[in-house]
Amino acid sequence: MNISLPSEPDEDCLKKPVGISDQFKIPDNQMTASSQHDTGCCKPAYGRLNGDRGDGWCAKEKRNRKDDWLQVDLGTTIEVCAIATQGDINGNEWVTDFKLSYSSDAQNWTPYNDANGEEMVRVTPRYFDASLESY
């Protein structure tokens, strides 16, 4: 299985969202994480774009943890042409960088490397009202 994230995603691909924002396409039990914040408002399944449940997914320790992960089982091999992240709808918290890996068996993971051969995918920090905008 191969994955590629072109610098300019194909328009046809962009018209076919994977469905992570839809809990009926990707059920809650197909979203898992390394940990979650104790309050119960930050479950892995709350890490969906445009979600209205909880505060999004939050790792147990919110600050400076580089080893936490959110995993989504897409159920099949698909083309991924873009990735979007969104901040907490109730506060000023959002992802600043992340690593992307893929697997066909949830055991053996291959890191996605960007055009520079770097494993880390950087998200340009944006300051915005997280309850109104998503990028």
Feature names for model-found ranges:
Residues 27-29, 75, 79-81, 96, ...:
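A short, local hydrophobic-aromatic micro-motif
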